């Protein structure tokens, strides 16, 4: 059964989850043209190829939590969502 605190505060589930993994790239085996493997695609992929760090940070002080989610759009815009959660 789910933890009552998680049901009451569904965002708390984010504290224990890892970010989704990016899709794996398919390996093209048996291609006769080796140069085609090393060519850069003309379009930018819609998902990152690797995630160096989690897209969110969690700070905890006494009874309060701060969850910050930072993402970048394809157009280069940075979006930051910051949630201040406090236990009453």
Curated annotation (Swiss-Prot):
The keyword Nucleotide-binding does not apply. Residues 39-53 have a biased composition (Low complexity). Residues 14-54 are annotated as: Disordered. One of its GO terms (cellular component) is host cell cytoplasm. Keywords: Early protein, Host cytoplasm, Host G2/M cell cycle arrest by virus, Host nucleus, Host-virus interaction, Modulation of host cell cycle by virus, Phosphoprotein. It is found in: Host cytoplasm; Host nucleus. GO terms for biological process: symbiont-mediated arrest of host cell cycle during G2/M transition. Signal peptide: none annotated. InterPro entries: Papilloma_E4 (IPR003861). It comes from the Viruses. Its main location: host cell. The keyword Transmembrane does not apply. Phosphorylated by host ERK. The phosphorylation triggers a structural change that enhances keratin binding and protein stability. The major E4 form is first synthesized as an E1^E4 fusion protein from spliced E1^E4 transcripts, such that the first few amino acids of the E4 protein are derived from the N terminus of E1. Contributes to multiple aspects of the viral life cycle including viral genome amplification, suppression of suprabasal cell differentiation and egress of newly formed virions. Induces host cell cycle arrest at the G2 phase by associating with and preventing the nuclear entry of host CDK1/cyclin B1 complexes. Inhibits cellular DNA replication by preventing loading of host replication licensing proteins MCM2 and MCM7 onto chromatin. Within the cytoplasm, associates with host kinase SRPK1, a splicing factor regulator, and inhibits its activity. Belongs to the papillomaviridae E4 protein family. Assembles into oligomeric complexes. Interacts with host CDK1. Interacts with host SRPK1; this interaction may favor expression of late viral transcripts. Interacts with host cytokeratin components KRT8 and KRT18. This is Protein E4. The lineage of its organism: Viruses, Monodnaviria, Shotokuvirae, Cossaviricota, Papovaviricetes.
């Amino acid at each position: 059964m789910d933890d009552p605190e998680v049901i009451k505060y569904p965002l708390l589930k984010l504290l224990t989850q890892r970010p989704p993994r990016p899709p794996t790239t398919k390996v093209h085996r048996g291609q006769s043209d080796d140069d085609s493997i090393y060519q850069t695609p003309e379009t930018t992929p819609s998902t990152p190829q690797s995630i160096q760090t989690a897209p969110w940070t969690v700070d905890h002080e006494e009874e309060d939590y701060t969850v910050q989610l930072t993402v970048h759009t394809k157009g280069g815009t940075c979006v930051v969502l910051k949630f201040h959660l406090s236990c009453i």
